Amino acid sequence: MTNMELAAKVIQELVHTGVREFILCAGARNSPMVHILDECKNLKVYSFFEERAAGFFALGRIASTRRPVAVITTSGTAVAELLPAAVEGTYSSLPLIMVTADRPKHYRGSGAPQTIEQVGIFSYYNEVALDLDSENSHLSFKSLSWKKPIHVNVSFEEPLIDGPVPQIHIPSVSERTKLPVQIPLGTLKEMETFVNTHKPLVMVGILPEKAYGTVLDFLKQYKAPVYCEGISSLRGHPDLKDVEIRSGEKMIHRVLEMGVCDSILRIGGIPTARVWRDLEDKYKELPVFSVSFNHFTGLSRPVQHCNSLDLLSQVEFSYPHHENVKVNIEDAARATQIRQLLDKYPDSEQGMIYAISKRMKGSSVYLGNSLPIREWDSSSSHDFPPARVAANRGANGIDGQISTFLGWAHPELENWCLVGDLTALYDLSSLWVTSQLDAKKFRVVVINNGGGQIFHRMFKKEIFINKHQISFESWAKMWNWSYDKWHTIPEDNKELNLADHQIIELSPNWEHTQEFWKEYDLLWKE
């Protein structure tokens, strides 16, 4: 089998299994695949020069399209650059397919140029690793769960281009087969027993878009107090106004301390709220039942768990949860006090998040790392909910965030991304792909507070913060994006006057931010 035939076989099998988009990091060793994809005009091919950004961009495309996406790299350290995306894809259950070109197998262990041990490099972070060459070209993607990345390593001999370019057939129907989700016998009964014998507080984390309706219907029927994180895309939903906690995650502690709720029902991804970590110690005796889209429980202790959100549509209640009146009264009062604080300190980080969130109703919003996520959950307006919200919360890293956002962006919506300054610095090459995208309206908002200020309240030591005085204006100029720096949020939409490709650098008032936190903490001590 020639190199060109082997490359065509791999690409054809990927197409048969449902791949319609390829992220191509062209090099010499993967040139057989480059030639084939360049001739195939019926497939979407994105061109990248940097593999780490390419991997995270692919995760965004997978999250947006709900189809597997393949990244193709050359050999050597280019392969290693995909590891961060493979880690995130594993914990987010996104089927990233990593196709890595390799030098012939007899070079392994030799230390020859651009020769590393590529097979097994992703260790735990792939569902299967296939090692192909002209003598061993069998590959199949059947009987996979499609909930973890997949590694296909392909060795090519020289000369690399050793024949004509084969044609790729694009079938009208893909043949990807998924293992049926196995809900263990008795799990439905276990959950019905849990919700009918406990008084849980419901915490909703990140959800696949197809699950929004199922989860919303369950919450409306069950009527338990519910804390919807922003990344659930259900925060501020009008159908939940009588059950949703709107004063922030500290109210969860109040609900548990008042005895209104005696357990936690987690729905969706692992929550970002601090109270979830407290389930390991402070609330270690509290019963927990998790209903998610993968097998990760998010806790080190044993809990009841189901890895299918479809279970929610099958649950029958003996009676709905009716513990909301007392919670609603206190929650509404505290939410009003918090809004007063936000109005009092409009140029604090929290006040700026509150104000800018009012511009995002019906938009796509991507939250890029820990601090923006927490500030969005504590401070954004419930009255102007976005159409969709997302984040990379599998491994909770700050790398590749803007690349993921660009992959996830919706072609028909205004797309906002909120990131911290260090997160933006991690992904400066991300804007490379902009000219290749169907989506047009991008707003990357960089909260520039001079370093990793999430650590300021945690450790009180400057060494954790990585202080800097960097401006992002040159970054915008480098990629020909428009740039604005805001010390306060414009009050009138007409004043925004945003370009299609817009970087907004927020410069919060440090003193106002600290005063906000002081008064916020005092509010919860009352």
From Swiss-Prot:
Pfam families: TPP_enzyme_N. It catalyses: isochorismate + 2-oxoglutarate + H(+) = 5-enolpyruvoyl-6-hydroxy-2-succinyl-cyclohex-3-ene-1-carboxylate + CO2. The keyword Coiled coil does not apply. GO terms for biological process: menaquinone biosynthetic process. InterPro entries: MenaQ_synth_MenD, THDP-binding, Thiamin_PyroP_enz_TPP-bd_dom. Its cofactor is Mg(2+); Mn(2+); thiamine diphosphate. The keyword Manganese applies. It is an enzyme of class 2 (transferase). It comes from the Bacteria. Its EC number is 2.2.1.9. Homodimer. Catalyzes the thiamine diphosphate-dependent decarboxylation of 2-oxoglutarate and the subsequent addition of the resulting succinic semialdehyde-thiamine pyrophosphate anion to isochorismate to yield 2-succinyl-5-enolpyruvyl-6-hydroxy-3-cyclohexene-1-carboxylate (SEPHCHC). This is 2-succinyl-5-enolpyruvyl-6-hydroxy-3-cyclohexene-1-carboxylate synthase. It comes from Bdellovibrio bacteriovorus (strain ATCC 15356 / DSM 50701 / NCIMB 9529 / HD100).
